[in-house]
């Protein structure tokens, strides 16, 4: 299991942040239906592998497909909240 900085800061006796999304995750995997959520702090569990989530990034929802490498991480790590800066070159030079 890979530990994020958020998971390391959390006490061991508290356990992972497990969230009930209000739907059956296994049915969403079979039906290929994305689960829409704003809970970025939810820990990804092994039963979520193969599911698609739409994670809120503050403005819109980012599509995230869960793979085995993501187990133990948080949903919010895969939905960036900030835009990457791109320097625009001018043609006058």
Swiss-Prot record:
Its main location: mitochondrion. Coiled coil: none annotated. This is Small ribosomal subunit protein uS19m. GO terms for molecular function: RNA binding; structural constituent of ribosome. The gene is rsm19. One of its GO terms (cellular component) is mitochondrial small ribosomal subunit. Belongs to the universal ribosomal protein uS19 family. Component of the mitochondrial small ribosomal subunit (mt-SSU). Mature yeast 74S mitochondrial ribosomes consist of a small (37S) and a large (54S) subunit. The 37S small subunit contains a 15S ribosomal RNA (15S mt-rRNA) and at least 32 different proteins. The 54S large subunit contains a 21S rRNA (21S mt-rRNA) and at least 45 different proteins. Component of the mitochondrial ribosome (mitoribosome), a dedicated translation machinery responsible for the synthesis of mitochondrial genome-encoded proteins, including at least some of the essential transmembrane subunits of the mitochondrial respiratory chain. The mitoribosomes are attached to the mitochondrial inner membrane and translation products are cotranslationally integrated into the membrane. One of its GO terms (biological process) is mitochondrial translation. Keywords: Mitochondrion, Ribonucleoprotein, Ribosomal protein. It is found in: Mitochondrion. SUPFAM superfamilies: Ribosomal protein S19. InterPro entries: Ribosomal_uS19, Ribosomal_uS19_CS, Ribosomal_uS19_SF.
